[in-house]
Amino acid sequence: MNDRLSKIAIQITSFVAPHNPGIVEGKLQDAEGVVHTFVDKVPLFTSEMLDAHSQYPQDGNLECAVLSRWQDIDGQSLVQIRTIESIEGISEFVVLSSQVSD
């Protein structure tokens, strides 16, 4: 749809490992209510300095490419995005448009 990257809102739920930078777990709920889990370096999710002593959950985001936008039959605005791969092996998601920012 466009070449600019957008951001998808996620919840950073826990600190996983004290590497440099640290590794955290983040969760994304898609438009159908399915929760997807991501595990990666802190800077991919937030500019905050997070560690094992930080409070969780915290707001975060992931860069994503917007593939398409539409409204479903109920008038709900949806967006298909591509981002890093979840631990379930999925990298394309349909989310609510309110979860995506430019």
Could you tell me what each predicted segment is?
Residues 17-19, 55, 72:
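Sterically constrained small-residue positions within well-ordered secondary structures
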Residues 3-18, 63-68:
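Structural detector for short beta-strands of small beta-barrel domains
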Residues 33-55, 91-101:
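Beta-strand/loop nucleic-acid-binding surfaces
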Residues 61-102:
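Short, compact, well-ordered microdomains
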Residues 19-27, 74-81:
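Short aromatic-glycine-enriched beta-strand elements
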Residues 30-34, 85-87:
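Solvent-exposed strand-loop boundary residues in beta-sheet-rich modules
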